């Protein structure tokens, strides 16, 4: 006879199964029958834990947003050694973020949240809006300061971009690179891979922000150049 899981454990099991189904099919096309089958329970038991698909979706979002915070955290600007070297802050942020995106499978990063983001973008956008607002709220002020410092130091030139716009451009590049690396064999025909692809992405977006090649080269992590 199969052992009955405690209520809390069963709830977590349902949320985990639902996350996989929502990520694969999106909110609109996912069904409670599919979720119940993935969780290996009856639809009736599913409704004992969650009164509706909407309630279950909200529970999944609350759970996955914590996992996605790990990736969002790599977009945070940090001050190396307590200095006000804006270029160094920006380059380290780009390096950390693109490394996390490109090495997702190698580092065993849980990409369920990212798959759900893609499904949300193809659907009603609820989760995508939540994630983008959350990421911006956490990072935009530090990014703005780093951009200002880099410009004041002469490392960043050209048209001034709003920090929110810069953050969105960077996220879009990283997000698509992560998307192409979700499978065991990357689907995008990049000429480079691994650490070299990270380096090229840093130079690409660093130049887009207005950083000079000299500033990027000077501040790129020495053991990764």
PLM feature segments, named:
Residues 59, 73-112, 163-167, 198:
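Hydrophobic alpha-helical connector segments
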Residues 2, 108-110, 114, 128-140, ...:
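Hydrophobic/aromatic-rich alpha-helical bundle segments in the mid-to-C-terminal region
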Residues 2, 13, 21-63:
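Helix-turn-helix
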Residues 67-71, 75, 108, 120, ...:
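A short secondary-structure junction motif
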């Amino acid at each position: 006879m199969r052992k009955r899981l405690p209520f809390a454990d069963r709830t977590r099991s349902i949320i985990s199964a639902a996350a996989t189904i929502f990520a694969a099919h999106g909110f609109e096309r996912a069904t409670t029958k599919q979720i119940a089958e993935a969780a290996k329970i009856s639809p009736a038991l599913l409704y004992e834990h969650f009164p509706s698909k909407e309630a279950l979706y909200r529970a999944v979002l609350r759970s996955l947003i914590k996992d996605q915070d790990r990736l969002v955290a790599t977009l945070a600007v940090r001050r190396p050694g307590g200095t006000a070297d804006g270029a160094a802050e920006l380059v380290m942020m780009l390096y950390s973020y693109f490394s996390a995106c490109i090495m997702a499978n190698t580092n065993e990063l849980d990409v369920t949240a990212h798959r759900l983001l893609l499904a949300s973008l193809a659907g009603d956008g609820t989760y995508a809006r939540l994630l983008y607002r959350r990421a911006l709220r956490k990072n935009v002020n530090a990014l703005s300061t780093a951009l200002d410092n880099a410009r004041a130091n002469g490392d960043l030139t050209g048209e001034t971009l709003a920090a929110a716009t810069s953050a969105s451009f960077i996220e879009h590049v990283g997000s698509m690179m992560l998307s192409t690396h979700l499978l065991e064999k990357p689907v995008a025909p990049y000429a480079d891979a691994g650490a070299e692809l990270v380096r090229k992405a840093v130079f690409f977006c660093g130049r887009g922000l207005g950083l000079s090649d000299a500033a990027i080269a000077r501040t790129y992590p020495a053991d990764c150049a």
